[in-house]
Amino acid sequence: MATRRQLANAIRVLAMDSVQKAKSGHPGAPMGMADIAEVLWRDFLKHNPTNPKWADRDRFVLSNGHGSMLIYSLLHLTGYDLSIEDLKQFRQLHSKTPGHPEYGYAPGVETTTGPLGQGITNAVGMAIAEKTLAGQFNREGHEIVDHHTYVFLGDGCLMEGISHEACSLAGTLGLGKLIAFYDDNNISIDGHVDGWFSDDTAERFEAYGWQVIRNVDGHDAEQIRAATILAQAEKGKPTLIICKTIIGFGSPNKSGSHDSHGAPLGDEEIDLTRKALGWEYAPFEIPAEYYAEWSAKEKGAAAEKSWEEKFAAYAKAYPELAAEFKRRVSGELPTNWAAESKAFIEKLQANPASIASRKASQNAIEAYAHVLPEFLGGSADLASSNLTLWSGSKPIRAHENVGGNYINYGVREFGMSAIMNGIALHGGFIPYGATFLMFYEYAHNAVRMAALMKQRTLFVYTHDSIGLGEDGPTHQPVEQTASLRLIPNLETWRPCDQVESAIAWQQAVERQDGPSALIFTRQNLAQMDRTSAQLDAVKRGAYVLKDCDGTPELIFIATGSEVELAVQAAEALSAEGKKVRVVSMPSTNRFDKQDAAYRESVLPAAVTKRVAIEAGIADFWYKYVGFNGRVIGMNSFGESAPADQLFKLFGFTVENVVAKAKEIL
């Protein structure tokens, strides 16, 4: 029988061999954390390699994602559908083993990590989802949701500011099933961290309200095992296990040095490491008895079978809850969703109201949340401004409302966004969270990660332009909406009234292959008249809102608060005998995906005289109006003044729009 160290060495050699074959990568972290991984994955982790999506599996997150060969080795050794050939294709085009772990490639990878700090933050989201789902579905004697979230993280994750945001909230919420292993090796890319990272990490996490287990030898299996048992016993606090490790463990000349962090060890050093570890096998060769010791298939199948028996008893006692649980974790929407959302939208169109689109957003949440118990909302300390609360909101607290549906994220925009990604990845919820559009900047990378992972995360942004007024340019977005539109696989919506707002929410909920950004105003917006055909066309991203007889001479394209301005300018020009079309374009991303025939029907190529109007950066719009068109937008930062004065100052008036249009008519 192989020893624990020998089993851990299987990880080490796979890591160094794969990195060497790829001619790039990070062998140091996998080699340093191999002993911790061996104990966790063989003694504690509840998972089933033959069903990586089992609902009650433990979640494992490698926050220090550059050490990706650690998780790939673990998945391969324990029996997931990840072959030795897949490991040989590490970092190669279209392989299942990209340079950083990517969700959707190798089975068993729970989230895409690499941008440091976001993995631990995703894990906080997963732990929140587990605790909340348990609160909503578990009943006495029937704990169908009962799993841990484990995280590996390093110095880099802890230096990133997002780790403070996430770990502070995790402590406040008492996430007792969140257990983090800190790879305390004192090394980062530039060398020994003493010169730039001298925090007392244990004191820091104790201040957050975590249980901290200090001074664990990360190469002593019994110490690691004892610490993990202690962590599992603490039900009311998350746990940080501080493991003292040696980066590149086993390498005679590069262990304990940044030389092993981010580059292949080299053939000569690998030979020396094999000798030092007593590893007599060829590259990528693992003895059959080692595979047998590592395999989690039998144990995992038994664990899932035991859970299925529990769930059968639960379904017998609570058939409706059981059916709802299965629906929720599958990601399917309720059977009445389509009819209810359609009826709500039609009701809004039939009952005009001139309200701020942020208020329209709240009304949509109110209507849809009654149909969608999977909504898990929140705001970064701006609920009264973002209007994200509804009549049934139940804020989650450490010991109250553990089955609630709303998270007070505090002033943590980046943390909130990455936590929502973790909630979405866990399953069972559709998370939405809000802040001012200007402060999306803090969270940009988490929004990008949601798009990369194709998660149904709903980002809500209010106070969308100079229209917020007196707070001034620090709070007035200019380039932010355009920036969001440029993120691949993110759909951005900027609706013009309560109807488009409700449709934007509807489309975001129904979209299962990526996130959406919903952008709303502070100021009131007039409701537009629409036919049933126009109402149905809103979801296509752009549609003809007002038209003329025959071929138009000019097309106005507008979004959000500027649609009314476009309509008024069109009316003024029409009174002078001009043929003008107004296109409302709430989602450029959605419109760009439409077939060529539809796009031509909205923006005919023959009509080259076009004017775009949006209180955002002007440059974005030339793709729609052409170089000979006109854009009425922002080319500078805003000012501190009442909103009506600012719109006049920056040219958002009927007179200026008409004048610009006449330049090309």
From Swiss-Prot:
Cofactor: how and how many bound: Binds 1 Mg(2+) ion per subunit. Can also utilize other divalent metal cations, such as Ca(2+), Mn(2+) and Co(2+).
Listed Gene3D superfamilies: 3.40.50.920, 3.40.50.970
Calcium keyword on record: yes
Reaction(s) the record says it catalyses: D-sedoheptulose 7-phosphate + D-glyceraldehyde 3-phosphate = aldehydo-D-ribose 5-phosphate + D-xylulose 5-phosphate
GO molecular function: metal ion binding; transketolase activity
Gene Ontology terms: biological process: pentose-phosphate shunt
Annotated binding of thiamine diphosphate, by residue: 66, 114-116, 156, 185, 261, 439
A matching Pfam family: Transket_pyr
Protein EC: 2.2.1.1
The protein's required cofactors: Mg(2+); Ca(2+); Mn(2+); Co(2+)
GO cellular-component term (any): cytosol
Chain positions of site Important for catalytic activity: 26, 261
Annotated Mg(2+) binding sites: 155, 185, 187
InterPro entries found in the cross-reference section: THDP-binding (IPR029061), Transketo_C/PFOR_II (IPR009014), Transketolase-like_C_2 (IPR055152), Transketolase-like_Pyr-bd (IPR005475), Transketolase_bac-like (IPR005478), Transketolase_BS (IPR020826), Transketolase_CS (IPR049557), Transketolase_fam (IPR033247)
Enzyme's top EC category: transferase
Protein's UniProt keywords contain Metal-binding: yes
Disulfide-linked positions: none
Residues annotated as binding substrate: 26, 261, 358, 385, 463, 471, 522
Keywords noted in UniProt: Calcium, Magnesium, Metal-binding, Thiamine pyrophosphate, Transferase
Catalytic residue positions: 413
Known partners and oligomeric status: Homodimer.
Task performed by this protein: Catalyzes the reversible transfer of a two-carbon ketol group from sedoheptulose-7-phosphate to glyceraldehyde-3-phosphate, producing xylulose-5-phosphate and ribose-5-phosphate. Catalyzes the transfer of a two-carbon ketol group from a ketose donor to an aldose acceptor, via a covalent intermediate with the cofactor thiamine pyrophosphate.
PANTHER family recorded: TRANSKETOLASE, TRANSKETOLASE 1-RELATED
Protein family per UniProt: Belongs to the transketolase family.
Official protein name in the record: Transketolase
Organism (species): Haemophilus influenzae (strain ATCC 51907 / DSM 11121 / KW20 / Rd)
